[in-house]
C-alpha cells in the first residue's frame, strides 16, 4: 500500500512557493485594481461559469461544479477573473480593500483522517518560517480551527506595502483544509486600518464553505 506524502514532502515539491508565496501579491493587485476600476467594472469581469445575481448589494451563492465546492459571498462583493488557474474564486470589495480567494492544490492521494491535523499544522509552520524572514510582515499567528465541517489550520499576519508615497498595510487570514484529494487555501485580505468593520461578515462567509 502506498504511503501518504508527508508535510515535508510537500515542501520538497515547493508547493508553498508555488501556491502561497505569490498569493499576497495577487491579493494586493486585486484590491488595488478594484479600487481603481470601481464595483461596476469589477462586476463586468464575473466568470461566466458562475451564476449571475440581480445586485452586488445582495449575498450570492458561488459554486464550482468541477471541484464540487460552494460558499455564500457577503453583500457588496464582486467576482473578478482569477489571475491564476490555481485560484478558483477571486471576489473583491472596493471599500476596505477586501478580497476573498479560494485556491486548490491536488494531492497524490487523501491524507488519512487521523493524520490530517498534524499534516495541516506542519504545513503552516513551514510557511510561517518563510514569513518570519520578511521584515515587512508582522503579527504572525497560527492555530487550528474549523471551516464549516472541515478541520482547518489558520494563519494570520499583516504585511506592509509601499506604493509610491502611499503606505498600505494589508491584513491576511489564510485557512488550509483538506477534502478528498484536494488541499484548499481560503484567504481573506483587508486594509488593516479598517479590517474590524468587515472581518465578521467575511469570516461568516468562509463558514458557509461546503463540498458536494
Regions found by a protein language model. Give the residues of each.
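Soluble non-cytosolic domains of exported or imported proteins
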Residues: 68, 114-121, 192-196, 200
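Conserved polar/disulfide-associated segments of primarily extracytoplasmic proteins
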Residues: 83-178, 184-185
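Surface-exposed amphipathic alpha-helical segments
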Residues: 77, 182-212
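Signal peptide processing junction and immediate N-terminal pro/mature segment
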Residues: 35-48
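Bacterial N-terminal signal peptides that target proteins for export
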Residues: 12-26
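N-terminal amphipathic/basic-hydrophobic helices that include classical n-h-c signal peptides
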Residues: 1-16
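N-terminal "mature-domain start" segment
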Residues: 49-86
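Bacterial N-terminal signal peptides
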Residues: 24-35
